UniProtKB/Swiss-Prot annotation:
The gene is mdtG. Belongs to the major facilitator superfamily. DHA1 family. MdtG (TC 2.A.1.2.20) subfamily. GO terms for molecular function: transmembrane transporter activity. InterPro entries: MFS, MFS_dom, MFS_MdtG_subfamily, MFS_trans_sf, Mutidrug-R_MdtG, Tet-R_TetA/multi-R_MdtG-like. This is Multidrug resistance protein MdtG. It comes from Rahnella sp. (strain Y9602).
């Protein structure tokens, strides 16, 4: 019989490196699953009865953007639940929920059903921000930049590989089976998270939860955190503004070429490849010199790369500049996330990261709209000048926010 005075056995410490590895695979699978269906999304919309060029463009834009819109709405709710119930259960909820929705998408019979399911996908999403929150609350603070930079490469890798694999699968098996394959990938993500990610979390009752006002009052620097949310949104606006016109711009540069799709795909992919290489290294550098310096410096360098993109004469020149731009962009969101974790406690990390995700989703919606509007009125090249101005504003805005409190005060 155990003596009453015998000390309790402490639980095994969390192996944060293993959790980081498994979360990376989860983000990779999630990124791949989302991008698997992107190459043929307009084609699938067409099979659901949408005809006519204008109608097809409108519905394709709607089914693409509605996911981000509903994700922005739902993220704060899921973030609050993560702070109450734990981050692992939110990862499981997201992976399983998205898997079920993907199956239903494969059975959609009309465009309205598909649109509703795309909205539901946004409502049930949130794997990546919850993975960020989980890892951010477990890693040593002096390794935050490296760990979050490494984690970000998971989603980027999946997003790079997904369109290629999705296109091959669609050509081989048809459009609907790809949704079922995507659902299987997400279910695999659910199984891996269930068995291999560990979290020691004490659930918090609803009455003991901090409300939104108390969450911001608990932050070390609430104004800076709000500035970082806006910074995240503008980063996504700048990234997304180029997406609608990239293929058309490449066609303008390449002239009559037989392999336009291949060249455009390469130029679209090279920033992600560069981000894979740069994010962990710049994150590690940020741990040494401060993530705020990395953030502002990389945005300033991005401006210098965007301007000549408007002046290039060949696809090769554009590809080289986009590779360098990707190396800069790979450091931006991990630097923001590192600064967020410096300024919040583990108690509210789920909500802070979910608010940041909401701002990111707003940027994902508005960026392509900005690029399309500018190109329609002023031409493709003007988009790069406008995007450079947006990034320049973001660099100045971020620098101003960060100067209001020194780095050491943020991490103490």
């Amino acid at each position: 019989m155990t003596s009453a005075s015998e000390p309790e056995i402490a639980p095994d410490p969390i192996n944060w490196k293993r959790n980081l590895f498994v979360a990376w695979i989860g983000c990779f699978l999630t990124g791949a699953a989302f991008s698997l269906i992107m190459p043929f999304l307009p084609l699938y919309v067409e099979t659901l009865g949408v005809t006519g060029h204008e109608s097809l463009n409108m519905w394709s834009g709607l089914v693409f953007s509605i996911t981000f819109l509903f994700s922005a709405i739902a993220s704060p709710f899921w973030g609050g639940l993560a702070d109450r119930k734990g981050r692992k259960i939110m990862l499981l909820r997201s992976a399983l929920g998205m898997s079920i929705v993907m199956v239903l998408m494969g059975f959609a019979q009309n465009i309205w059903q598909f649109l509703i399911l795309r909205a539901l996908l946004g409502l049930l999403g949130g794997f990546v921000p919850n993975a960020n929150a989980l890892i951010a609350t477990q890693i040593p603070r002096n390794k935050s930049g490296w760990a979050l930079g490494t984690l970000s490469t998971g989603g980027v890798s999946g997003a790079l590989l997904g369109p290629l694999v999705g296109g091959l699968l669609a050509d081989s098996y048809g459009l609907r089976p790809v949704f079922f394959i995507t659902a299987s990938v997400l279910f695999l993500c659910f199984i891996m998270t269930l068995y291999f990610i560990r979290e020691q979390f004490v659930p918090v009752s609803k009455k003991d939860m901090l409300n939104r006002k108390q969450v911001f009052a608990s932050l070390k620097n609430p104004k800076l955190v709000l500035c970082l949310f806006v910074t995240t949104m503008i980063i996504q606006v700048a990234t997304g503004s180029i997406a609608p016109i990239l293929t058309l711009y490449v066609r303008e540069l390449a002239g009559n070429t037989q392999n336009l799709a291949f060249i455009s795909g390469m130029i679209a992919s090279v920033p992600g490849v560069a981000a894979l290489m740069s994010a962990p290294r710049l994150g590690k550098l940020g741990d040494r010199i401060g993530p705020e310096r990395i953030l502002v410096a990389m945005m300033a360098l991005s401006v210098l790369l965007l301007i000549p993109m408007a002046l290039v004469q060949t696809p090769l020149q554009l590809g080289i500049l986009r590779f360098l731009l990707g190396a800069c962009d790979g450091a931006l969101l991990p630097a923001v996330q590192t600064l967020l974790i410096y300024n919040c406690t583990n108690q509210v990390a789920g909500r802070v990261f979910s608010y940041n995700q909401s701002f990111r989703d707003v940027g994902n919606v508005t960026g392509p709209l900005l690029g399309a509007a500018v190109s329609a009125s002023y031409g493709f090249r003007t988009v790069f000048f406008v995007t450079a101005m947006v990034v320049l504003f973001n660099a100045g805005y971020s620098y101003w926010c960060l100067q209001r409190r020194p780095h050491q005060a943020m991490i103490d």
